[in-house]
């Protein structure tokens, strides 16, 4: 995990994704939260954590085997895993983690993490953009982020300043990735929030709970 990598002095990065347990069009798909760590220099896999129900065990088994085999993160893209709509997707979540790392390391996209959010410039020197729907934005959003839904982004490009870096957020990281690819093609310097608002909300709430309660769960007075 990250604490072990930090204790070992390893320069690492991570990807966070929320894939479905099997093809989303087939009934009964469940969401899972995946985090995959890799070493920056060698790209070797360091570890993985998955939270969910159906399908979690086999993805962990695949990743554990890949780590044991000393595979690089990019080699995850080449794994030809079993597929049928009730059990997986044409591109398995393990493949998708590899593709995300490939995009990062090739420079196609840049990301920032939940613990970077409070350090983002709020003085107008950067554009903070939330590309979720208006309803999602109203239910909760990061301070200082302006809402332009992804479907409307092309119509609002002239409102964004190209000489300012853009930090993009969505619910799980997919729409912010797509927004960054679009903005990059139009000449913007762009980064998106790894794991999106969902991951940020879970992690920060857990930290708040940890600070205000004892390990047993009793609130501190």
Spans of model-derived segments:
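Active-site flanking residues adjacent to catalytic metal/cofactor-binding acidic residues
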Residues: 129
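A short, polar/charged loop-to-alpha-helix boundary motif
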Residues: 53-73
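Mid-to-C-terminal Rossmann-like scaffold of FAD/NAD(P)H-dependent oxidoreductases
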Residues: 1-53, 85-89, 93-119
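Residue-level marker for well-ordered alpha-helical positions
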Residues: 1-3, 60-61, 177
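Residue-level recognition of short, well-ordered coil/turn positions
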Residues: 10, 70-71, 125
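Anion (oxyanion) recognition and catalysis
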Residues: 6, 67, 184
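Rhodanese-like catalytic fold shared by cysteine-dependent sulfurtransferases
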Residues: 74-126, 134-167, 171-221
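Anionic group-transfer/hydrolysis microenvironments
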Residues: 37, 132-134
